[in-house]
Amino acid sequence: MAWKTLPIYLLLLLSVFVIQQVSSQDLSSCAGRCGEGYSRDATCNCDYNCQHYMECCPDFKRVCTAELSCKGRCFESFERGRECDCDAQCKKYDKCCPDYESFCAEVHNPTSPPSSKKAPPPSGASQTIKSTTKRSPKPPNKKKTKKVIESEEITEEHSVSENQESSSSSSSSSSSSTIRKIKSSKNSAANRELQKKLKVKDNKKNRTKKKPTPKPPVVDEAGSGLDNGDFKVTTPDTSTTQHNKVSTSPKITTAKPINPRPSLPPNSDTSKETSLTVNKETTVETKETTTTNKQTSTDGKEKTTSAKETQSIEKTSAKDLAPTSKVLAKPTPKAETTTKGPALTTPKEPTPTTPKEPASTTPKEPTPTTIKSAPTTPKEPAPTTTKSAPTTPKEPAPTTTKEPAPTTPKEPAPTTTKEPAPTTTKSAPTTPKEPAPTTPKKPAPTTPKEPAPTTPKEPTPTTPKEPAPTTKEPAPTTPKEPAPTAPKKPAPTTPKEPAPTTPKEPAPTTTKEPSPTTPKEPAPTTTKSAPTTTKEPAPTTTKSAPTTPKEPSPTTTKEPAPTTPKEPAPTTPKKPAPTTPKEPAPTTPKEPAPTTTKKPAPTTPKEPAPTTPKETAPTTPKKLTPTTPEKLAPTTPEKPAPTTPEELAPTTPEEPTPTTPEEPAPTTPKAAAPNTPKEPAPTTPKEPAPTTPKEPAPTTPKETAPTTPKGTAPTTLKEPAPTTPKKPAPKELAPTTTKEPTSTTSDKPAPTTPKGTAPTTPKEPAPTTPKEPAPTTPKGTAPTTLKEPAPTTPKKPAPKELAPTTTKGPTSTTSDKPAPTTPKETAPTTPKEPAPTTPKKPAPTTPETPPPTTSEVSTPTTTKEPTTIHKSPDESTPELSAEPTPKALENSPKEPGVPTTKTPAATKPEMTTTAKDKTTERDLRTTPETTTAAPKMTKETATTTEKTTESKITATTTQVTSTTTQDTTPFKITTLKTTTLAPKVTTTKKTITTTEIMNKPEETAKPKDRATNSKATTPKPQKPTKAPKKPTSTKKPKTMPRVRKPKTTPTPRKMTSTMPELNPTSRIAEAMLQTTTRPNQTPNSKLVEVNPKSEDAGGAEGETPHMLLRPHVFMPEVTPDMDYLPRVPNQGIIINPMLSDETNICNGKPVDGLTTLRNGTLVAFRGHYFWMLSPFSPPSPARRITEVWGIPSPIDTVFTRCNCEGKTFFFKDSQYWRFTNDIKDAGYPKPIFKGFGGLTGQIVAALSTAKYKNWPESVYFFKRGGSIQQYIYKQEPVQKCPGRRPALNYPVYGETTQVRRRRFERAIGPSQTHTIRIQYSPARLAYQDKGVLHNEVKVSILWRGLPNVVTSAISLPNIRKPDGYDYYAFSKDQYYNIDVPSRTARAITTRSGQTLSKVWYNCP
């Protein structure tokens, strides 16, 4: 049929072009142009996001919006001053527009449930879709044929609908509004449209069922998938053809993808597609709605993103669209849903369009996803893209958008391709379509998905081959989709993400993937089936399934898809995959699915998916994540399955095939991959590798890949670029896959991570992560995975990052060696053993890939990558290592892990980077940048998402992260985002499920890991190992580790940060926990165990210890920073991003306060962080003051009284807090004025002195401006302290102690003299009932030799001193030993090469 429809599509395309031209005749008016994609050639635009970019035609509002109707506005966020609202809360305030019930009520409420419900139906829908598929294409065609314009209009409507639906509509609001507007305007068609819309809506509903075809696809995520599938199916030929064409287009597509959403508008074909899509979407929407709901939450963010993205997309679309649109349109129809996304995308692409179409769908999905994810992804993507750079931009779509166009092209192709990959994923369906051509196309779609774009981007290149990926991805997506369906559960979650995402993406993906693939191939049925399956599984698994399916599917599918037959395979695979996944899913089911899927998906997707997956995954994950499933799933499945399922899924499919080869690889990958992927490129590599492999695999392997794909897919997806590597990639693939799997596995861990992830993810920051990865990885693996993501993110950027990561990884690499071990470990997890071997190999492969990846990542990465690569492998290894380590980490690290993630990522990355960096740095830098971007983006996105989603997302994020991780990897962002998301959920869920399953497996695995590596156990040791490993890396490693550790935290933080932060704070504990969690992630049990550990560690204090060890272990250098972060886990994290430096206590900046707690712990405070210092290990990871101490930061100063109680006082502005060790006393804060006899002014440092003979206990307040005031405590009877504080040998005692001691003794005489002075104080003893505040005097008057600028001061317990203390004051980079009795201060000169931070903080 596809072939038959091809001509039609072509005709449609022609007509579309014509129409487009026609419609473009009057470019200064929106008449007939409402919702059309963005075009740089137009003087003004009418896409639904034009307002965001202030590029709307003057009559846009009049022509394209309806003030009193909810048509297309269901997902827009609330805005003041409107006559009526259509957001989910309007009912609460009784301000809903009159037609709210008919347009949005269902979406907002039932949706959720429906979602679930629907989700399942989607299965049915899928079937329907199947029909639909056929039908869809037709209608679209018909429609399209009818009139592009009309179509367009319709599309618009649909678009609107869809948009609205999509709302993911991210555009949602924008779109919605726009849509609404457009609708209204729509040409006056508004009415018609309205009717139509209503009709559509009904149709949608009905259609969904009925049209289901289109809708169904949409409908369920599966629908979406279907949709994708559908059109995909239809599209297939066209698509394929187009795809092929598109392929090229892809480039464009990519851009388009962005458009995707907008694409919708593009309409024409989009329209048709849209219709379908819409329907689909609608359904989806419903489902999606749930999603939406979810999405809605997301919405905001999504919206934003969406909007942005949409706009971008739209814009892109528009411009792209136009042509593309047309083209697309035709194909689109097929894709219809896809179109939508794709359309846009396609449009751009034109040919791609078709493919795009899928994209469309995807887009759509993506959009939502994007949106949702988008936010995550998009944003992320951007970053990711960034990574991809081109893509990213594009991805950013929003950013890209604009960029896209250009970018797109440029990128597009790649992007598309790449994207495709992702898209593919999404596209997958497309892929099917794609199948072969599709692939390209697919990519395109992918692009749309793009969101995935980012990934896609990567993939895109891959794209062609990607297709497989795509498929794969889609699969993931699909799963996702299904997930969505399943999501159902997730739905909400999923929905949100998934749904939208999923649906959109997933659906598309799934469907698409499967569908497309299948359908296309098996054609619809299959598709349907596939989708269904996917979906189905999804439903079943629902989350799980979907996810799983997704993954597996994706993998499989993907794989298949590419293959086409594959497709069927996909289907089957898919199915199986799903099944497996499902299985996993079942296990986790939810979890699993996600997990599996996610993981895998992510994995698969991840890479590709990443984008998509990411999206999807993210979405799903996200969703899922929330679901955790993913996480869980991953965790669980992953773990268990994870290995099996997840792995399974991915692995399975992947593994299976891949497995064999890959498998090991995967395994390895997993181990390695994770490691590698994770680590190395982890992200990049991963990605790249994966990608490459993937690609290659897919492409070549594709088939094989399929298997691999799955793994590969992920990989593939992931890497398209890898494509190049492709070959290697395959190998890589495995890794990738593995990775993925690994990831997955890792993921699992990742999940853990995710959970942790969140942290980790944040960690993600992957870059760091990578670095961390190793360490983290282990733990991290999950983390790593996550990490990966981070890396991923970086990955993309990362690639570069990757490299860095890799670098990191390299460090890891160093580890690498270990890695193998680790891998083993990791592998253990998966193949564990083999993995190791393989992994190792893979790793290499990866590296290899990485290079490709790098390529992909392109060169930047590449260059780096190479290193990375090497590293990568190493990294991989490291990763593994890391993983193990992580494990350990996890254990210990757990926190660290988290931290690690976190920090590393952000901070570390940089930092790490730094260390590693340098190499990495470059990379990193890039990465960072990228990362940053990504992270940033991510963060942003994440944040957004996070925010919105946050809770959900968080979970998701995590998941995503995981996914992301995987995915992210591709996108860092996503990851982040994901992470963020996931974490939350993940954590929870994950923990749970994971725990269970994960635990088990993981545990097992882990244990295995552990055992294997010991790592887990060892982890810690591992750490060391790692360290060594790292060390191997050399310092870097160290850093890495350190990073890792921090990374965990940091990153997450970072990304998470946002989220975490959010969460973190709350989470902090959680974070810690989470961190722990992350570890958790890894093994839940472990987690638990870890957790505990972590927790302990996590616990601030406990954490410290734990941390300390761990951090110290490798933290030295970075540690500070990282440690810092880790310490803070969440907190630190945040900073992390930029902070790298802020969280690095060893950067030479003076601290705000340094004190010893009553229990002898030496604590340094600077900015928003604090570090626990130990004489024998590097500083702990930075932790947030606010999260642990509960006081606002930064503080002005801190001091601990030199008496038996040893209370610690914090000063901030005009208030002070009193703590007993780290427990805040009741009744604080209190005004400084009242507590210290009228003390006022800006306090910069405080030195507490002990009571000795006639000297009263007092405290000297150094104030801004060089003055000092002494406050003498009310005198109390002399008492012997029952158990004196523990005598600790502080680092500073090393060198100057003796001299000081002699000095002190010599000074005793004067002391007495002083005593007399002080006698004054004694005189004051009269005021025994209260303390006395002396007048302000210049510092130099009170103490000779002390500079006017004192930044901090400390009383160190020293049992060898007469009064039991040594007193020090710090001024910039110099410190002084203060002799209280003689009132003199002597500057301490450190031995050559020693710095103040080395002496005091034991910095490396």
UniProtKB/Swiss-Prot annotation:
Residues 348-855 are annotated as: 59 X 8 AA repeats of K-X-P-X-P-T-T-X. GO terms for molecular function: polysaccharide binding; scavenger receptor activity. Residues 235-252, 266-276, 1073-1085 have a biased composition (Polar residues). Glycans are attached at residues 123, 136, 206, 240, 253, 277, 291, 305-306, 310, 317, 324, 332, 338, 367, 373, 376, 384-385, 388, 391, 399-400, 407-408, 415, 423, 427, 430, 438-439, 446-447, 454-455, 477-478, 485, 493-494, 501-502, 509, 525, 529, 532, 540-541, 553, 555, 563-564, 571-572, 579-580, 587-588, 595, 603-604, 611-612, 616, 619, 627, 676, 683-684, 691-692, 699-700, 704, 707, 723-724, 736, 768-769, 776-777, 792-793, 805, 812, 829, 837-838, 892, 900, 930-931, 962-963, 968, 975, 978-980, 1039, 1159, 1161. Residues 26-69, 66-108 form the SMB domain. Residues 111-966, 992-1104 are annotated as: Disordered. Highly expressed in synovial tissue, cartilage and liver and weakly in heart and lung. Isoform B is expressed in kidney, lung, liver, heart and brain. Isoform C and isoform D are widely expressed. Disulfide bonds join 30-34, 30-46, 34-64, 44-46, 44-57, 50-56, 57-64, 70-74, 70-86, 74-104, 84-86, 84-97, 90-96, 97-104, 1146-1403. Residues 1-24 form the signal peptide. Its main location: secreted. The record marks 1306-1307 as: Cleavage. It is found in: Secreted. It holds the Pfam family Hemopexin. It is linked to Camptodactyly-arthropathy-coxa vara-pericarditis syndrome: An autosomal recessive disorder characterized by the association of congenital or early-onset camptodactyly and non-inflammatory arthropathy with synovial hyperplasia. Individuals with CACP have normal appearing joints at birth but with advancing age develop joint failure, non-inflammatory synoviocyte hyperplasia and subintimal fibrosis of the synovial capsule. Some patients also manifest progressive coxa vara deformity and/or non-inflammatory pericardial or pleural effusions. Plays a role in boundary lubrication within articulating joints. Prevents protein deposition onto cartilage from synovial fluid by controlling adhesion-dependent synovial growth and inhibiting the adhesion of synovial cells to the cartilage surface. Homodimer; disulfide-linked. This is Proteoglycan 4. It comes from Homo sapiens (Human). The lineage of its organism: Eukaryota, Metazoa, Chordata, Craniata, Vertebrata. The gene is PRG4.
